[in-house]
């Protein structure tokens, strides 16, 4: 591997992404597939690119990602978090701008567990007066 490689681990919901960034031409590879091929929906692709567009490094870095667990939204969020951490490793001066955009903080929201006696996490069974 290259000597100038930067790493960041990103997490969101049940997804975990391992992100490797190095100098290049702007290729983003997710699980051995190009970004456009891996994510079918445009919003997920947009979420992944957000930190790179913010610091204007879209065509300066090659990003290699392995991501596990969760669905499309969770994986996209995990990749975004990982890219943000890799960028901060590359240049600590980028931290304030990334923080103000809200990319540094890990989104702690997870699926709430189903409770006994309820139909879902909070949905109660239908009540009948008579």
Curated annotation (Swiss-Prot):
Parts of the chain that traverse the membrane: none
Pfam (any one): Ribosomal_S9
GO biological process terms, semicolon-separated: translation
Any one GO MF annotation of this record: RNA binding
InterPro entries: Ribosomal_Su5_D2-typ_SF, Ribosomal_uS9, Ribosomal_uS9_bac/plastid, Ribosomal_uS9_CS, Ribsml_uS5_D2-typ_fold_subgr
Keyword field contains Ribosomal protein: yes
Domain of life, per lineage: Bacteria
GO CC terms of this entry: cytosolic small ribosomal subunit
Keyword entries, A-Z: Ribonucleoprotein, Ribosomal protein
Family note: Belongs to the universal ribosomal protein uS9 family.
Protein name: Small ribosomal subunit protein uS9
Organism: Shewanella baltica (strain OS155 / ATCC BAA-1091)
